[in-house]
Amino acid sequence: MRTLWIVAVCLIGVEGNLFQFAEMIVKMTGKEAVHSYAIYGCYCGWGGQGKPQDATDRCCFVHDCCYGTVNDCNPKMATYSYSFENGDIVCGDNNLCLKTVCECDRAAAICLGQNVNTYDKNYENYAISHCTEESEQC
């Protein structure tokens, strides 16, 4: 299932939220988003289960929780307005649903940037079958 996220990002091209989120990640972490975060830990990528493995994975867990609060639009496909100003991400949509999705992505990208030093190559391409501990609540 998580491999579908990679395919979706590639197929979306310059359209859609996943591309926008990937662009935010690159800006905030300096890492290539798909290679570094599409299949990382228990939560970075499509879906998620178990306990986040480190602070980087926790950013993705919180992002999943944030997407869970979104109503009235598909957070993985919604296209929103945003810009980069003075090293920060600024969400600029008037539509509440799109602004919420943008803010979820913004917070996750900032979190990943703040925790880039916790990134552990051992969690790249991490098998979801290792994510067996009980998940915490959002």
From Swiss-Prot:
Enzyme class, one word? hydrolase
Q: What is its EC number?
A: 3.1.1.4
Any one GO biological process: arachidonate secretion
InterPro entries hit by this protein: PLipase_A2 (IPR001211), PLipase_A2_Asp_AS (IPR033112), PLipase_A2_dom (IPR016090), PLipase_A2_dom_sf (IPR036444), PLipase_A2_His_AS (IPR033113)
The UniProt note on the cofactor reads as follows:
Binds 1 Ca(2+) ion.
Compartments, as annotated in UniProt? Secreted
Which GO terms label this protein's molecular function in UniProt? calcium ion binding; calcium-dependent phospholipase A2 activity; phospholipid binding; toxin activity
Positions annotated as active site in the UniProt record: 63, 105
Keywords of the record, alphabetical order, are:
Calcium, Disulfide bond, Hydrolase, Lipid degradation, Lipid metabolism, Metal-binding, Secreted, Signal, Toxin
Q: Which reaction does it catalyse?
A: a 1,2-diacyl-sn-glycero-3-phosphocholine + H2O = a 1-acyl-sn-glycero-3-phosphocholine + a fatty acid + H(+)
Q: Which family does it belong to?
A: Belongs to the phospholipase A2 family. Group II subfamily. D49 sub-subfamily.
Report what the protein is called.
Acidic phospholipase A2 Drk-a1
What species is this protein from? Daboia russelii (Russel's viper)
